[in-house]
């Protein structure tokens, strides 16, 4: 289930005061928390009353609106209560094409079952020691 959430910015306005420092107030663009919660609960309780009478239970299948912003308003209040709640978005399902099977590729693998299995051309430069001896280097080219 997916939904869209838009939170309008809070406006800070200075209030006139007799004190030299101005006071700021928060103006929320929507109704108060109490009125918004009562409307959400009344919508929710009418749709889920047949299922349960527990106010902490939410019926996710009975409403066309996403309930997550409403729950956020109840839990954290503040900015969450000023959110616009939009209808749930249903994503279109697209058929997935099966990947084309690639042809098997022949590869040449080195045998790594001996402690001296190295690339002979690079062995003397990288490892030195016995890998620089003529007996080991004779098959390098």
UniProtKB/Swiss-Prot annotation:
sequence repeat start and end residues: 67-81, 118-132
Q: How does it sit in the membrane?
A: Peripheral membrane protein
- What is one Gene Ontology biological process annotated in the Swiss-Prot or TrEMBL record? circadian rhythm
Q: What happens when the gene is disrupted?
A: Slight increase in nonphotochemical quenching (NPQ). Marked decrease in the accumulation of LFNR1 and LFNR2-containing thylakoid protein complexes.
Q: What organism does the UniProt record list as the source?
A: Arabidopsis thaliana (Mouse-ear cress)
Instruction: Tell me what turns on expression of this protein.
Output: Expression is controlled by light and by a circadian clock. Differentially regulated at the level of mRNA stability at different times of day, being a target of the degradation pathway mediated by the downstream (DST) instability determinant and thus following a circadian clock rhythm with highest levels in early afternoon. Rapidly degraded upon illumination; this degradation coincides with the release of the LFNR from the thylakoid membrane.
Region annotation 2 X 15 AA approximate repeats: residue ranges? Answer: 58-132
Domain of life where this protein originates: Eukaryota
One Pfam entry for this protein is Lir1
Q: What is this protein called?
A: Light-regulated protein 1, chloroplastic
Give the keywords, sorted. Answer: Chloroplast, Disulfide bond, Membrane, Plastid, Repeat, Thylakoid, Transit peptide
């Amino acid at each position: 289930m997916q939904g869209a959430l838009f939170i309008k910015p809070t406006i800070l306005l200075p209030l006139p005061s007799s004190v030299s420092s101005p006071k700021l107030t928060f103006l929320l663009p929507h109704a108060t928390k109490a009125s918004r919660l009562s409307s959400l609960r009344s919508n929710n309780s009418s749709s889920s009353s047949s299922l349960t009478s527990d106010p902490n239970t939410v019926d996710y299948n009975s409403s066309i609106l996403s309930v997550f912003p409403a729950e956020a308003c109840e839990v954290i209040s503040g900015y969450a209560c000023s959110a616009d709640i939009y209808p749930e978005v249903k994503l279109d399902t697209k058929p997935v094409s099966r990947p084309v099977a690639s042809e098997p590729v022949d590869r040449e693998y080195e045998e790594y079952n001996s402690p001296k299995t190295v690339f002979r051309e690079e062995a003397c430069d990288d490892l030195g020691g016995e890998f620089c001896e003529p007996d080991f280097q004779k098959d390098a080219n």
